[in-house]
Amino acid sequence: MNDIVDIVVGFDQREAVAYHSFTQSVIEKSSIPVRFLPLNINSLTNYKETHEDGSNEFIYSRFLVPYLMNFKGWAIYADGDMVCLEDIKKLWNLRDNKYAIQVVKHDYKTKIKNKYWGNKNENYPRKNWSSLILWNCEHKSHKILSPDFIQKQTGAFLHRFNWIKDSEIGEIYKEWNWLAMEYEEKQDINLIHYTIGTPCFEEYENSSLSFHWKKSFLSMLDGYFKKNKLD
């Protein structure tokens, strides 16, 4: 198993602060070395985004993770609009080589019709399964995940993991991908996903569980001479 945890994180310049707040939250809690790779569309030289239905810039590039890891070892993929409240080692320790991926298998109908930037928030099978993934990058089923292959596939095919068997999809408990504004507020959460909108956006500044995001954001500003004016 890897000595360093590789974490690939969705990055969209329009909410760059979300990426940095998330990585800050992981760094603060982690008891093992971590290595971040931002999924920045500008730096993916062998991949050209051809899909036109994405609500953010990493909605399809996340499926490049095994390719980016040279089809070796394991990696975590996480959307950028998250905050980690627990040691990432505990998630890392859930890896099971009999699976190609491991995800939280959400089963819900959304309560909210629209999300950030006015995007429609529609229901579809396996919604939000792909927002947090433990990737077994060397699993044989992933060998087809080349940049060219991903560019040609539909969102439904990719986000439902249709290139692998259902038996190859392991399950992680919901506390590792807790959906703010969709699930109730509670104390024992490991990772919050602000899937409707990150509290960096004005309309979600005081939304459910926003306190945790603001705390990570302010911690990320340590060393900034104007931080005291933002507290």
Kindly give the residue locations of the regions a language model identified.
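Alpha-helix N-cap/loop-to-helix initiation residues
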Residues: 15-16, 84
